[in-house]
From Swiss-Prot:
It comes from Escherichia coli O157:H7. HAMAP family: RodZ. It is found in: Cell inner membrane. Residues 30-49 bind DNA. NCBIfam families: PRK10856.1. This is Cytoskeleton protein RodZ.
Amino acid sequence: MNTEATHDQNEALTTGARLRNAREQLGLSQQAVAERLCLKVSTVRDIEEDKAPADLASTFLRGYIRSYARLVHIPEEELLPGLEKQAPLRAAKVAPMQSFSLGKRRKKRDGWLMTFTWLVLFVVIGLSGAWWWQDHKAQQEEITTMADQSSAELSSNSEQGQSVPLNTSTTTDPATTSTPPASVDTTATNTQTPVVTAPAPAVDPQQNAVVSPSQANVDTAATPAPTAATTPDGAAPLPTDQAGVTTPVADPNALVMNFTADCWLEVTDATGKKLFSGMQRKDGNLNLTGQAPYKLKIGAPAAVQIQYQGKPVDLSRFIRTNQVARLTLNAEQSPAQ
């Protein structure tokens, strides 16, 4: 009877109460149980008061109760019904897995952005290349046009400078036709006197007149020589005037150009006169004079060295950009584009 009553009384007790009674029978304190089980005193107190800590999972709580029961020598089978009530197994809340659609969407958006960036980059590179090619082609066409224009001007100048056919018909000197026969004695007397030859006049290269020997004889015979006839034999020859030779003075506005490679250029002075227009070969040089300021067009600035008023002209800005040089040289040597 006493055994059955004790069994019924144990069943009436909760799990926490049975663990507390067993601890007190063994003379253990909550602090001693907490130290042996490596638990907090508050956790041991919650177990004895049948409280389930909110921050403690049911699996851990059941494990702590079993360890406590073994410590106070209570069979685990007797505590199982109470464990189901005090610490029921709760289904773990599984957090829903985050879909990868967001990552895929972001990756797709990044892919479109990268594609658009590359497309813009290719368009910029293509436009830059097209602009450079058009500029280069325009410069080449301009140089070709200027060269053709120069060739046309040179050909027209050569056609205008062709020699005109000369009239070589012999003209009769009226002095020789009207000379009476008595002039023969005069010419005979002249043959005995020393003949003073006058210096031959300079021949103009622009004149293409040709004098025949017969005309030269007629002119010599027609020239009166009374002075030679009256000059005694021992007299000194008549003094002749000698043309004074003058050294040309260097023009302060002279434009000197030396060429290190083939180059096309055109030079115009202030009056609009073209001092030069055409091609200059390598190692050539030009020395031009005119009325300042000069206007220059140079197809290859790197191939020419210019000196104006004895000072070099800076063409570096045209050489760096590799373009046709257009500049004006004024009296103060300040080239302006």
